[in-house]
Amino acid sequence: MKYAILCSLLWLTHSIATPLSLSDEVFQEAQHILQTQQESHYDHKTVINESKGYYRVDCSSFVCHVLRKKSPLALAMLPIDVHHVHARAQNFYDYFKQLESVPNAHWMAVKTLFDLERGDIIAWKYDLSSHKKDTGHVVIVAEKPIQEEQTLYRIRVIDASKGKHANDTRAKESDGIGSGDMWFRVNEKGAPIGLYWSSKEKKERQHFIVMGRVQH
């Protein structure tokens, strides 16, 4: 009995003494917004009223809002395009790509998909030939990747989007902030090279994909 009590006290002491990592704080903030939002919409014009739980955001303004609350220094490192007020998906991509060769104190590159942790950020950039209006997409990792095939992993993400993922929390006719499952294809080095937005039965999308982790 005394041994069991001692073990419980040691575990409690360890839990109190071990603070959350910054990336885990990013996840917790995104999860808090997901659970407490009253209304959200996907829009490139950002309007946020936290007291009312109202969010009108796109994928990048949502992630920037989370970073602003948890790591404004890391957010300040991200480049911003001319005539824009926050980093967009392509800026996340370009910055994370640069991290692979030039790391810094605020961010680190995550080079292999199976090393992702909660709160890490995945960004991909659309090829200019696709003629898409958006520059790409950016999501926050909600759960560690689960391997389903030799080169295919399922990941639960939190994002702001128009389209829904598999097992999505967004209502049928709604968009905005939600959580759902995506699948990512990796190469022989474990780096992501393709994705399935909502179903493995649909065509795999090939994009330039990178990953980053906030550290300070």
Where are these regions (language model features)?
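Short amphipathic alpha-helical segments that mediate assembly, nucleic-acid/protein binding
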Residues: 2-3, 205
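Sec-dependent N-terminal signal peptides
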Residues: 3-13
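N-terminal capping segments
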Residues: 17-85, 204-216
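Acidic Ser/Thr/Pro-rich low-complexity disordered segments
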Residues: 72-94, 165-183
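...with weaker cross-activation on analogous glycine-rich loops/strands in unrelated enzymes
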Residues: 80-165
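Low-complexity, Gly/Ser/Thr/Pro-rich intrinsically disordered linker/tail segments
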Residues: 160-216
